[in-house]
Regions:
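A short core secondary-structure module
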Residues: 13-54
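Charged, glycine-rich active-site and insertion segments that engage polyanionic ligands
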Residues: 168-169
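Short, well-ordered loop/turn elements at secondary-structure boundaries
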Residues: 7, 24, 39-40, 66, ...
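A structural signal for short hydrophobic beta-strand segments in well-ordered beta-sheet cores
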Residues: 3-4
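Active-site pocket-lining segment
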Residues: 143-165
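Glycine-rich beta->alpha junctions and the first turn(s) of the following alpha-helix
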Residues: 53-151
């Protein structure tokens, strides 16, 4: 998504694809590229009523949260709507470190839930006169799943401790 200087503001063209809760939102914080490189990224505030702004078809993530693509066709952004100019991106994303840890925790919880559902099934399902949890091949699968879950937990803990100490993501 590119922002080009136009009068006292900017013209923005491009798109954003995975924008959480976008079907219901009217105002958006949009990252734009003023020029190449990490120092060329900043952000603007955009309203759905702005000429050239449109939304795509609504879809859902696996957790049921809705999203839709956002399209910008030469949308004029007045200078009052420029939140961060070029170089502001580094400051703005520093707040995402905690969010990344939350996303990791959510994924770990989903993995644990799936493991427990599979375990209950293996403890009750019978095949050839035995519970399927008694078959060695099934036990290997459960061992591998548990190792992956615990490795994920340790990585999550390490990330949380390091983020609290101010280490970069």
């Amino acid at each position: 998504t590119k922002a080009v200087k136009y009068g006292k503001g900017f013209r923005v063209s491009g798109s954003k694809v995975f924008t959480s809760n976008s079907p219901d939102a009217d105002i958006f914080l949009i990252y734009v590229r003023y020029h190449e490189g990490i120092n060329g990224i900043g952000s603007v505030i955009m309203d759905t009523s702005m000429l050239g702004f449109s939304k795509g078809k609504s879809s859902k993530y696996t957790n049921g949260e809705e999203w839709c693509a956002l399209y910008f066709d030469n949308v004029y952004i007045p200078e009052d709507n420029v939140l961060l100019g070029p170089g502001g991106f580094k400051k703005q994303i520093s707040g995402f470190n905690a969010e990344r840890i939350g996303n990791s925790a959510r994924s770990l919880a989903l993995g644990e839930f799936a493991f427990n559902v599979a375990k209950e099934y293996a403890l009750t399902r019978e095949q050839f006169g035995k519970k399927i949890c008694e078959f060695q091949g099934i036990q290997w699968k459960f061992s591998e799943m548990k190792i992956q879950i615990e490795a994920g937990r340790l990585l999550l803990y390490r990330a949380a401790i390091n983020a609290d100490k101010g280490f970069p993501s």
